[in-house]
Design a protein with these regions (language model features):
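Structural motif
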Residues: 85-88, 131-140, 185-192, 232-243, ...
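A short helix->beta-strand "capping" segment at the edge of beta-propeller domains
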Residues: 39-65
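Loop/turn-rich, solvent-exposed surfaces of beta-rich toroidal or solenoidal domains
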Residues: 208-249
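A short beta-strand motif characteristic of beta-propeller blades
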Residues: 52-62, 94-106, 148-157, 199-206, ...
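Blade-loop segments of beta-propeller domains
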Residues: 94-129
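Short loop/turn segments immediately following the C-termini of beta-strands
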Residues: 82, 127-129, 181-183, 228-231, ...
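Beta-strand-rich domains and repeat architectures in extracellular enzymes and scaffolds
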Residues: 56-83, 111
Length: 320
């Protein structure tokens, strides 16, 4: 294919074309020799793991008060701010709020990241965070009705995790996953705990490693992470990646989506899938300049940061 000087494809479009071309070349080479149905199916399966799993069509966006995480139980949306929890109906009406969420915590915290909701409980990734450095990580559980604190999971320092930016529940394996925004070793892994016992199980090395991971969510056998890897100053989009985790010590990372439809490029945060509608929900911030995870003024035309939940219809893609 050819590119003109006036067209610059996004990373997502470029990777799709490259991988589809590779798949076509490989399939063509296989076609000159006998190929069983099983071999063809195995080949398609191999290439499908390099490509996005779904096509995403933007439905709409609703403004919310929180800037960190989004979760849904199918009836409500739960949104986290750095120091607050909010509950919305699906029209965007605020139902409840808890602006003192750390009350009852054994270890003081000042920051909540991405969240999840499961069986009437909100799973909160909490810590002390300042200028790109996190400490005192906690896995806190809040009541989904009242948003009040209930209990904590024990964090395992020997895991090597130095910061927590998001948390999710694997409904199939009954485990809890956490991600880290901080780079170097901590940000190269996802960390798994038992949902039933709270015991730390393992960490999984990501290949390649996404930059500045903000949120994580489990959906139909895969983990999805958001990465604040686009440079807002240059109008670059952030991205969503898919991770097919197995029992191994490492997992391949696939580009799932580029966030090109947002009103203005800024900072991607948490994500989830509404279990009733199968719509992907992505929290995105715009207007504020973010340096090392902290707000440092505003872009021209803004005097405050705007937080929005983008809702996407998902259609599974099939490699024929």
């Amino acid at each position: 294919w050819a590119f003109t000087f006036t067209f610059q494809p996004t990373m997502e479009v470029f990777m799709k074309k490259v991988l589809m071309l590779l798949a076509a070349v490989s399939l063509l080479s296989w076609s000159v020799s006998p190929c069983s149905a099983k071999e063809s199916k195995d080949l398609a399966k191999t290439y499908s793991q390099w490509l996005p799993k779904y096509e995403y069509k933007l439905k709409d966006a609703i403004e919310v008060k929180g800037r960190q995480g989004i979760a849904s139980d199918g009836e409500f949306y739960y949104v986290s701010n750095s120091k607050a929890l909010y509950k919305y109906d699906k029209t965007g009406k605020l139902i409840a709020s808890n602006e003192n969420p750390f009350e009852g915590y054994a270890i003081p915290s000042n920051h909540i990241g991405d969240i999840d909701v499961f069986n009437g409980e909100i799973f909160v990734s909490a810590e002390n965070f300042m200028d790109g450095v996190g400490k005192d990580i906690q896995i806190a559980i809040h009541d989904a009705k009242t948003l009040k604190f209930k209990r904590t999971f024990k964090f395992e320092p020997s895991s090597g995790q130095e910061e927590v930016s998001g948390i999710c529940v694997d409904r199939d394996k009954r485990t809890v996953w956490m991600c880290s925004w901080v780079g170097e070793n901590s940000g190269r892994y996802l960390y798994e705990y038992s949902l039933d016992t709270g015991k730390y199980l393992r960490k999984v090395h990501l290949f390649p490693v996404p930059q500045w991971v903000q949120g994580v969510f489990y959906y139909k056998g895969a983990l999805y992470v958001t990465a604040d890897d686009g440079e807002a100053d240059f109008d670059e989009p952030d991205h969503i990646y898919r991770i097919n985790v197995s029992d191994g010590t490492s997992a391949m990372v696939t580009l799932e989506k580029s966030l090109t439809e947002v009103k203005k490029q800024g900072e991607i945060e948490g994500l989830c899938v509404d279990p009733k509608t199968d719509e992907m929900l992505v929290l995105y911030n715009r207007g504020a300049r973010i340096i090392l995870g902290m707000g440092k003024g505003f872009y021209p035309g803004y005097d405050h940061e705007i937080h929005e939940v983008y809702r996407y219809r998902m259609t599974e893609l099939k490699l024929k």
